[in-house]
Amino acid sequence: MTTEAADATDRLVTAFDHHDPGYTPRTAERINTEIRERGVTWSPAYGGIWILSRYADVRAALTDWRTYSSARGVHFPRAEGMPMFSPIDYDPPAQRGIRERMAAPMTGDAVSAMVPELRRMVARLLAPLAGRGHGDLMAEFAEPFAIEVLGVAFGLSESCRARIREATRTMWTYISADRDASKFWPAFHALLAEEVERVRDEPDGSYLARLAAMRRDGSPLPDEELYSIIVSFCVAGHDNTMNSITRLVHTLAQDPALQLRLRREPELRPAVAEEALRRWCPTDRFTRVTTREVTVAGTVIPAGARVVLLFDAANRDPEKFPDPDTFDPDRGNSHQHLSFGHGIHHCMGVHLARAEFAAVLDELSRLPLFDLEQPSDLHFENGRHIMFDRVSVRFRTGEEH
């Protein structure tokens, strides 16, 4: 570790700020580990925030929504003028109603019906890379795959699919930098309004068309509520998936022995996907606000406190996952990670995400072995999403499929 990185680590362990320039993918794991080893901690950032980082503490907070409320927004600090996102920025009973309206495209039955199409997408996107023997598995595969799945599952137009990634990237940039929603929300709002108008004018039977036609107490859902639901689908539906798949294929590219094992033992593939999610959480943290004074591991957190939940640190807690920094698909409890959340805000897209991972691993196991062609650089997007700049790989020639 460089002197600069060491200084940043020392500073941020006691004054944690996920938007500090010193909090990078290279320093974050060490910072999160040291914070976890200290137990419940407090930082003066943003007027004072509390940090929970042990697995048991984070899971308990996710379970107890009455004490740890989402109703003041889970993204923090919030950009001025930023809308509330559905359903993650709501508590029951409103949260329950929103989830019910959002559930249709992500039920087990709906996802099962999509599986053949998922497999066709994966095969079609990977074929050109394998055919020429090399390519970028992030830009040429993970990103377009995640966006195409989103479009098919929810009924987004080709035009919207082409623009959604840039709109999301712009949003994350300004949330963390200027914290001014006027820099990103009007354009995002216009994109969503265009989609809603399209399906209202020409209903096509898609989930989006059904959502736009929904009524509550005899009246149509307000447009702003629709946009809040759709933006949550658009962002979570492709951003987290893209980053998770990128991490998964990057892991495989560095481990040909694991690739071979997945060919011999296809039953191991789900465990590999879950272990990748545990080891590299796609969304590093969310926040809550306490509704009452609460004692955690002997530390009193006052009512009205902003609490940061460090998912990465919890997923690497040795009390829950022995030797946590080692990628080990045989550990047996990888699926108990918190990368999909827990409790009332448990990820609604979990069935779809797991079906996507299965399709990816199945198709890659039919292709030649592949190796990382050049190093990949990591960066934070909005201080929460750890992303690669690329995953450049080369497929081996003459390898057994």
Swiss-Prot record:
It is an enzyme of class 1 (oxidoreductase). Optimum pH is 9.0. InterPro entries: Cyt_P450, Cyt_P450_B, Cyt_P450_CS, Cyt_P450_sf. Pathway: Antibiotic biosynthesis. Disulfide bonds: none annotated. Heme binds at residue 347. Its cofactor is heme. GO terms for molecular function: heme binding; iron ion binding; monooxygenase activity; oxidoreductase activity, acting on paired donors, with incorporation or reduction of molecular oxygen. The keyword Secreted does not apply. It comes from the Bacteria. This is 5-methyl-1-naphthoate 3-hydroxylase. It comes from Streptomyces sahachiroi.
